Structures are given as C-alpha cells and as structure tokens.
Amino acid sequence: MTALTQAHCEACRADAPHVSDEELPVLLRQIPDWNIEVRDGIMQLEKVYLFKNFKHALAFTNAVGEISEAEGHHPGLLTEWGKVTVTWWSHSIKGLHRNDFIMAARTDEVAKTAEGRK
C-alpha cells in the first residue's frame, strides 16, 4: 500500500495544475507497470490487466467503476475477453493531475484481490 492509495481525489477544474515535470517521475515510481500514452496531445496513464476469462474481466471493470464513483473520478475502460485496459487522465485539464496517480494506485489495489487474474 502506498501513500497514493490512502489519498483522496480533489475537485479538478480547468485551471487546476498539471503534474509537473519534477513530480512525474516521483509519482510514476509509485505505480509500477503503468505507461504514459499520449493521444491527441493529451498525456494519459494506461495499464492492461489480464484475466482468465471475460467474466473475471467484467467483474474487475465493475470494481474499478465502484472506486471511481466513490472518488468522482472516472477512467477510460476497455473490457475484452481476458483483458481490461484502464486509462486515467483528467478531462478538465486535458492531461495528468495527481488524481490520476491516486486512482491508478487504487486500481492496482483492486487488482491485487481480483478473481481470475493471470
């Protein structure tokens, strides 16, 4: 468990600061195996989780949905047979905010107890 898993998301408005170049490597070290992807000029965090079948992948998707609703911050989720791709970014600032790293860490916590992980 990291400090990020204990933190809570804050309201993120259009004028909220992006994660700085100095903060980025520090935060990334706390969420191993997450990748930075840039789509349409927007930096995002992304990770693929593998499962034994679609049922387990769907259950994980729903569990991520539950923690997302609780924090009011929602990812991109692509659920496929045996695989869930989770993508975090802050829509309002079109980039990465500390909230995205908090939720990536929490997603990893959910994955630790998810049934049917490969």
Swiss-Prot record:
Pfam families, alphabetized: Pterin_4a
Membrane-traversing stretches: none
GO biological process, one term: tetrahydrobiopterin biosynthetic process
EC number, as in UniProt: 4.2.1.96
Domain of life of the organism encoding this protein: Bacteria
Enzyme class: lyase
UniProt-listed InterPro entries: PCD_sf, Pterin-4-alpha-carb_dehyd, Pterin_deHydtase
Entry's family note: Belongs to the pterin-4-alpha-carbinolamine dehydratase family.
PANTHER family assigned: PTERIN-4-ALPHA-CARBINOLAMINE DEHYDRATASE-RELATED
Function, in words: Involved in tetrahydrobiopterin biosynthesis. Seems to both prevent the formation of 7-pterins and accelerate the formation of quinonoid-BH2. May also have a positive regulatory role in the expression of phhA.
HAMAP family given in the database record: Pterin_4_alpha
Protein name: Pterin-4-alpha-carbinolamine dehydratase
Lineage start: Bacteria, Pseudomonadati, Pseudomonadota, Gammaproteobacteria, Pseudomonadales
